[in-house]
């Protein structure tokens, strides 16, 4: 809640009737840069002076209210001014000058008995800011009376400061964009369009945004045989034998690189992200050595933890993983990172800036140089040295010298890696490269005024603050627009220790963002965030806020970040404090749930989807046994236990769906979204009933309209926790028995099932107790199927329908998951998936022009066909018919797609053309024909059989 001066509180508590004045500062179109000019207006009955500025009265006709809620939205406001054609603003508008995108600031002043402005804001000793934003639209209406005097009314539509969030502000891996190139006197020159002056001479993306093909060569020894003869019997005869030998053969392979420009993401915490290739070339004298430069993230990052070569990381997951492939160290429990390759010993430290790492995955030598995106980093010396000697293939092809990659290629603020591949018989193409990145260093502010900026943070508020204040990729808001102590207070709530699990339960601690496996790392909200900078600032801010249940508002002119939280000292409001306009709304029947199914990307599963599923038996009993499932997806949470706690809170919140609306006087000014309220209303039997503020609407006359959301005390981040840390530690190893007898049954012919149904997967349940659901991964699909285990009959098959899938090879991987999140080993099934069979056979398929008494002969030059439409056309859109025509040798003459009609004429001209096509252009016709037809749908639906003639 925005604080106001104690003297203002006393005045407002002792004065029921208030005189308010809105003070408007409207930027004029003549403003430019720092030389902004304004016109100052007020809706008060007389002129008002504030801070030495005169606000003129008599022009402002009306001002609307300003509303904000817990959902990030662009708030709006409108106001009208009126006057004669001689007025300054009216003259400008009537002369065609636009006020669009000009700034506007409105203060709401309280005028005391002495006619002075009451000091309210402790930061300025003046009035509170009512609105700040921009003009986004408007209109003018003229009125000329009988005496010829004309007046005009202008209505301005304004949007608050969140209007500026509706833009994309990311860096593009393109040289022209990076350096701000523009044409000057016919040549490209860097300009102030670069996000930093230093970027103007940074050539790091010079080779990007191009397609490159490289001819790589490598040598292999191939087995050969030669015939060897030997004389026998004094030269009268010979014997022959084959002798094996090896010959060195040079082979060539074309390597295609698409260096298309992309937006550089922002990473906080630890995440796996794909590399963006920005340079590729081979060594001139060693054409099997390929260098590729990949951009990964905005810097400066803490470092790289591991690289994935294709689908395989350099660091082993566990003992089993190390037994099946070439890898090093252990991610599980030990927390090894790629720096082990350079250090030679076990370490959980991230990579070192500029360090070379050597690795061999069994398919050939790989070398990686890591660069963390420092603001002053220098060019990679390994590439500079090669280019200096003209040692690159494309460099020589294009006639370039050392400038091909010299000291100007710094890639400032860009976390990137150089990867050197050796092409050989085991590696004939460049694999996809992705990396586990420990993200951007952020500033963390402390109550004592100190600032730490030496590492990344899992705290969503510090991530949000970094993004909001960045001019390079974020909202570009200056720090002085945030109440810093308020931000610090809210951030501490996210750092409360989660006591629902023990540290040892998180074996992949290093890859969920922890630096060490200590209990103080169990913060209740931990975000590992990727921000797609090709999306708008608005969408990215919204995504972070949703990840920690936060809100941001600027009702008082500051950007105030708040968290949903419980308070033992909420603002207390009695019904008698309101204007009596109370409205209670209850939507509990629609929005309450008794079970939850949530998904997250889990580093313990090689960054594949994991699921959290549980239900509340008490809630289900209240819902009379009906299953009501809440679906959640966590984009920025990768810690299973953080996601589990969040899902539990959201399930509890869903049981509270009552909202309370009413209006209060100006003495409650400063209320903002997410403020805790204790409301008392004797008629309802409420005594300090707990609510959170969901929406605030400040009106011009000082009345404040509120919408409150009911909650219990146990649904918040800072609510009293249930300590599960003393429970048995979940076994890290897989001790959940797998499902049994996994098989696929296609939809039988002639059976009409669900629309587009291919068939059914079925299995017998796991024999492990406490299995709550089954996860089925489907090749080519991101999200798995989730099937709840509601019954415990071990001999009753469980079923998952497969609907609307195209025909072809499909691989299904089935696992059982118990109540603690433990997963069984997978049961895999490869299926040559049939098409979705669910449509009826076409009926009454016939030849219309048959010979009398002989349905096998047609009369006339053409064959006229007809059929009846299938009944499914009434329920399935976009049904069409496929008609195929064959000759006497069963060769297809043509296949025709037919829509919205149920007849087809196979004309004589068609017949002649089809005959000529299959008979080397000879003249003639097909006299014996076979026709067949079936119905099909856009989602893979097909008739279960063909109708034939």
Swiss-Prot record:
The keyword Ubl conjugation applies. It is found in: Virion. Its main location: virion. Ubiquitinated by the Bil antiviral defense system when this protein is expressed in E.coli MG1655 strain expressing the Bil system. Induction: Expressed in the late phase of the viral replicative cycle. Keywords: Late protein, Ubl conjugation, Viral baseplate protein, Viral tail protein, Virion. Homotrimer. Forms a pseudo-hexameric ring. Interacts with distal tail protein pb9 and straight fiber protein pb4. Forms the simplified baseplate, together with the p132 collar protein, the baseplate tube protein p140 and distal tail protein pb9. Closes the tail tube and, upon infection, opens to form a channel thereby anchoring the tube to the outer membrane. These changes allow the tape measure protein pb2 to be expelled and phage DNA to be transferred to the host. Also forms the start of the central straight fiber, which is continued with the straight fiber protein pb4. This is Baseplate hub protein pb3. It comes from Escherichia phage T5.
